[in-house]
Structures are given as structure tokens and as C-alpha cells.
Amino acid sequence: MPSLTRILGATVVSALAAATASAGDFAAFTPLGFSEDGKVFAFEEYGQEDGSGFAYSNIFFIDTEKDAFLEGTPFRLRTETDNASISAARALAVREALQMIQDYNLLDHPGWLAAFNPVTENNGDNGTIRYRAHPNLSPVSEMILETFPLAPNAACRDITPDARGFRLTYRSPEGAEREVHEDERLPESRNCPLDYRLGGMMTYGGGGPDAVHVALVIVLSQGFEGPNGRWIAVPFRP
């Protein structure tokens, strides 16, 4: 499906580039879209590992009602050769995920990247984002990220003994607050987390009753040559 691959490529031309291996490994983020009913959201993270230099691409499909991966996902591709490019890893990941991308018509329902706050943004506040659900000057909502100490998993006990979890609080345009996520444990998929940053907000459906918001959280974990950054998507209904 070269045409779809070209479409995906065009979508990400201006995306944040992955950090070089000498400064840790910070994955770039690209949203792939929503299903028409908003019950599925997908995104890609990609980059080059520090230490090994291997290129990778991970494509996640999120059930926005259950806040869980769809069965059989995510698709994780890692090119274990020194001369493999990031584009090659991404092409392989798209090939694996293509049927699901088509089944859910994701490219027809991009949603809105309502706010974006990558690690390169120096705004003095890594834990709060104020955003509008739709560009039509809809009311301003707020997402607040807080961290707290949480016991590391067994594999990370000696690496990050001061591990942390996070909670997310949504503040409506009317000022009402609601907790939408709080870690109870640290999954192994996060590796050994050191800290978190609120990286952005995706929205779908505007301000209607079926609207879906997705908090984008950057997980900062211990890497080989410095901290690494990976993405988590936390969906909720406002």
C-alpha cells in the first residue's frame, strides 16, 4: 500500500525529530487518528535507541473506553542492525499495523492536537496544560499532572529506587475537577521511570456528549547515555 505509506509520511514531515543517541533517546510522537465513534485512538512513537543506535517504531491502538491496548497491539519494531534507518523501522511498523489502520479508518478522523508540550518546550510548567477542545474558540479546559513516590518493579529496584508514579486531574471550563488517572503500580513497559511531563492533549468530537480527550504523557526513564523519553496516551470523556 505505497499510497497510504506516502500519506503517513506526509503527515509526519514536521513532527518532532528523535534525539540523538549521545543525549539520550527521546521518541518523537505522531498521532494516527481516531475511529469514527471515538472508541479507538492510535499513535506512533519512533526514534533511535541510545547505546545500541538501533532504530525503532512503536504503534499503539488504545481502547478509549477501557483505557487499554486493543488485543494484539501494540506493534513494536526494532531494527537490530547498525545501518538501519528510522524510516525503515517506521515502514515496517506501518506494514504490521496497516490492516488495523484501515479497519478503523483512522486517517479519516485525525482529531485535534489541541496542545503540544514536548521536552524541548521551555515554558516553566511541565505539569499543566490549558487547551480548547476545538479550534472554534470553545471554552478552556485544563489538565494537571502530579507525580508521587511509588515502589519500583523488581527489575528497577536497584536502578531507580526513588521511582515515581503520576496522577492526572481534569479541570472543566466551569472549574469542576475530576481525577482521570492515578497509578497504582509501575508497569514493566515503562522501564525504570524517573519523572513525567505532560506532553500534550488530543481531542475528538469537539464539545459534544461523545467527545474524547487524550492526555499525552512523556515518561522519563533511565537510559544508557542519559534519560529516555517515551509516550503514554490516557483517554477520558470530559
Predicted regions and their residues:
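N-terminal signal peptide c-region/cleavage motif recognized by signal peptidases
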Residues: 18-20
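Bacterial N-terminal signal peptides that target proteins for export
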Residues: 1-9
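Exposed acidic/polar residues on beta-strands and adjacent loops within beta-sheet cores, strongest
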Residues: 22-238
